[in-house]
Amino acid sequence: VKRFFECLFLVLSLAVFPTHVKAQDAFTTTRDYVTQFYPLWFTYYQTSFGTVNQLSGPNRITPIYHYVVAINDDTIYATSVLDLSMEPVILTIPSTPANYSVLTLDRYNDIFHSALPDNTPGTYALYGPGFDPDRLPSKITPIRLPINYMTLIFRADKFKLVDGVEQDLTSEADTFRRNMTMVPVCAYLGQNCPAGVPPGGPTRIFPEIVFALPFKAIADKLIARDPIAFLRQLQTAVKGPATPPMSPEVKRLSEHFDALFATSTLNQRPEFASGAQTAHELITEDYLTHIDGTNWISYKNIGYWCHNPDNFHACTNPDPGSSLAIQRSSITEYIQYANDHEAAAYFHAFKDGDDIPLDGTDPDGYVLTFSRKKLPATKRFWSLTAYTPDAIELVPNSADKYLVASYTPDLKKNADGSISIYMARKLPPGVPPANWLPIPRGPFNVMLRDYGPLENVLDGTYVPPRIEKIR
């Protein structure tokens, strides 16, 4: 009898997990699946709360806002979830004295340079593949998008340098955002629209609390505590209609994971869980170790993860398990919806120049000094923002101050022409308020942005100065 049950246990064990190879396959496939499709989890669930074929944005940006990772307060936002599968949309952009930029992305956050220009008012028709542009109204500029489901983001600058003086155009930028309209072509022509076509209209402005859902924190906690639940949610996102077309290699990965996961048993779940958690470790490690000699993290290829970046219509996803796939996911984890390097350069620091993690426990804080020749070359502006350690969101502070920028009113230069930014919990004695960036009591990180990079920032050779601990 004992021998019978020993044999039965062996047979059942082999049926549940026939070989070590199957366990390894579950682990590696899950690891590659998560690193490949990680951005889709974010965009699938974020866009389910977004306005479809209509621009929208928060009434203001404060630490309550958690919707997008590494949000900043130096521009005014308007965003639309585009679904062109039923009807093109007519986008009307008014004139404004404020500078603004346009960003168009797919659900992976791959960037598509459409013909929709920055700083150019007009009426544009956005249409997807399969639509005949000859059917569009005359005197409207047609803009073809490579796929039907994309995200459109406008960023309007609050300040503008005019004759050497920074002009506050916050009100004008907000008016510009509110006056943009997006409607289906049928409504534009005064026709009855098919059922299910979003009506569109002017930009909708929502209270910031609407954007409080912390997607990054949710993803991080799910992977750490319930990776199987995260995998099920990721499967739902991957199978969503807005997922861009897959290359044969990526499609095989998706189908192979689905088959393994569907036939797995409870005894096999640890391999899937371990694969998901290892993928998350790879994603975070890639970002946090992508540093230069002064401990600033910087990527020069943001948005260009596909095999054919010069032709988005022929774009295919990076190979499963490749460094590009991991990099794309790491950008989603730490600086979602980032511009490409030509539009904006990003430098992110979690450590000071001595390789010690940034921590605001010591009240003396830190200083970042740009020599006159080390200021980021820019045609728009540069800014420095402090963030919380895990969610990468704005730091709550009594001053309601979240950045120091080249346009900050009353920003003071040192006698030699350099600029020092002081990072501390409270305004240090003798420091001009404009040069102070509030930080939390405990770990934090800072991001330097250059909108419209020039010279050595644009060519990728610029390295920001060290962050120094004040002693």
What is each stretch, according to the model?
Residues 17-23:
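Sec/Tat signal peptide C-region and signal peptidase I cleavage site
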Residues 6-16:
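Bacterial N-terminal signal peptides
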Residues 1-4:
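Positively charged n-region of N-terminal signal peptides that target proteins for export
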